[in-house]
Design a protein with these regions (language model features):
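A short beta-strand-turn-helix
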Residues: 25-46
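Cleaved targeting-peptide boundary
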Residues: 18-25
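Hydrophobic h-region of N-terminal signal peptides that target proteins for export
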Residues: 9-17
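Non-catalytic, surface beta->alpha helical segment in thiol-disulfide oxidoreductase systems
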Residues: 105-153
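Thiol-based oxidoreductase modules, predominantly thioredoxin-like and allied folds used
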Residues: 27, 72-93
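Short active-site neighborhood of thiol/selenol oxidoreductases, capturing the structured segment around
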Residues: 43-56
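Typically the conserved alpha-helix immediately C-terminal to a functionally engaged Cys/Sec
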Residues: 60-74
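Sec-dependent signal peptide recognition
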Residues: 2-9
Length: 154
């Protein structure tokens, strides 16, 4: 019985930890982007690609704000979202580079692309790398500016 309890709590801890990880470390990011581009072409909706990692507190803060903060309604209405794991800057780096995302400036980093896979906007100076200090309101203001800017570029 003691072994069962230990195994149960270990399994519970693993499941809880996985729930806190917004970036799928085993996902095929290129395939996810390709599939999202297909969906976006139907609705003519731009795509936000968020490059981040599960060890990054600012990445987790941004993810939380995008799911439940003031940004959530704005983003779900105007964008499709793909999250790309960059690990310890050793995963999907080529993909970030292909969208002009300078990971060295910090993560999370964002690229906004059209349904035709054309770059609309890229964070260039680590604009979201201090998401914890920005808080929900600062993240919302950033998304509001980027949304307006991306609509103007259409």
């Amino acid at each position: 019985m003691k072994i069962f309890n230990v195994l149960f709590f270990v399994l519970l801890a693993v499941v809880a930890r996985a729930a806190d990880n917004p970036y799928n470390e085993t996902a095929d990011a290129k395939l996810e982007i390709k599939q999202t581009l297909t969906q976006a072409a139907v609705t003519q909706t731009p795509i936000i690609i968020v490059f981040g990692a599960n060890w990054c507190g600012d990445c987790k803060m941004l993810d939380s704000a995008m799911k439940s903060g003031a940004s959530a309604t704005l983003l779900s209405r105007d964008f499709k979202i793909v999250k790309v794991n960059v690990g310890r800057f050793d995963t999907n780096v080529d993909l970030a580079r292909s969208y002009g995302v300078p990971l060295a400036k910090g993560i999370p980093a964002v690229a906004i692309i059209s349904p035709k896979n054309e770059i609309i906007y890229v964070t260039q100076d680590g604009e979201l790398a201090n998401a914890r200090q920005m808080g929900d309101n600062g993240i919302y203001e950033f998304h509001k500016r980027v949304t307006a800017w991306s609509k103007a570029k259409k």
